[in-house]
Amino acid sequence: PAVAVQAAAPGSSGSAARAMTVVASSPPAAASTTPVPAGAPTAVEVALAQQGDPYRWAASGPDSFDCSGLIMFAYKAAGVSLPHSSRALRGMTERISVDELQPGDLVFGGSPVHHVGMYIGNGQMVHAPHSGDVVRVASVYSTSKPVSFGRL
């Protein structure tokens, strides 16, 4: 099934409002035997709604986030409790390939892992990049190398 989400940047209005629609459909016959969590569409919607919120180390919302704090906050809204650590998140996911990615899957960067974002479809993720930046959408390959992917 397709997931369609619209989110406007916080504090924006009128012609200055930034809105984004993401439509992602399931790829055919993924090799992973683990289904995407039932709360994934809600988590994607919540994460996208945080666009424009500032990055702050160790923050988990509601008005600022670090990378794992954004994931934790979004999945908490979907009824899923997760740790506030990109490495801990990596350790609890099933490794999947880029071809298996579904909205709600996690994108990890670094070796050892030190960054995480949430896949939203079409090769894009929503993430809280680093100090001085804001929650935003970017390519899954815009994070620290190497990049790996996981399913909760």
Identify what each model region corresponds to.
Residues 1-54, 143-152:
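Intrinsically disordered, low-complexity
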Residues 32-36, 60-64, 139:
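Alpha-helix initiation/capping motif
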Residues 36-39, 63, 99, 109:
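Residue-level signature of the cytosolic catalytic core of signaling kinases
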Residues 50-103:
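Catalytic cysteine-centered active-site loop
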Residues 51, 57, 68, 116, ...:
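Short glycine-rich loop/turn motifs that provide flexible caps or phosphate-binding loops at active sites
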Residues 80-134, 139:
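...with weaker cross-activation on analogous glycine-rich loops/strands in unrelated enzymes
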